[in-house]
């Protein structure tokens, strides 16, 4: 019942979930003593303890520093590689290149592009979505992935009022 204490099996499941996301060492730390990234990993572990087939993440990297963003994205990618279906919302198109096999761009609640990240996260699509000029470049030097770089220019569409950013 909902008022009972966790069983040994419950504790084992919780510890396994903490291990999966790489924070088993935080098992006994009070939640008030966790960083933002540790807290976010704890929330993902809590969801994993329910043994879901699908996990929906709404901006799991928001308000996190770069290091914790990468840690979260690595966990997301690892869980997906193990077969967990993940639906993740993000305002950072780069995240699709790091953690997605399929991605979509939504505009005013409507899906306007869907497919592999290389097909969807393009300069043209991002310019239309955000109303600014965005460069999508392949980064080498040991990284070998694409990244998005917003310029400081409004798109020509934005200047004429023809963008979709409403």
Regions found by a protein language model. Name each.
Residues 130-166:
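ABC ATPase nucleotide-binding domains
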Residues 30-34, 38:
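Conserved ABC ATPase signature
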Residues 51:
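Conserved catalytic motifs of ABC-family nucleotide-binding domains
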Residues 90-91:
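H-loop/switch region of ABC-family ATPase nucleotide-binding domains
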Residues 8-26:
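Conserved ABC ATPase "signature" region
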Residues 55-58:
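Catalytic Walker B motif of ABC-type/P-loop ATPase nucleotide-binding domains
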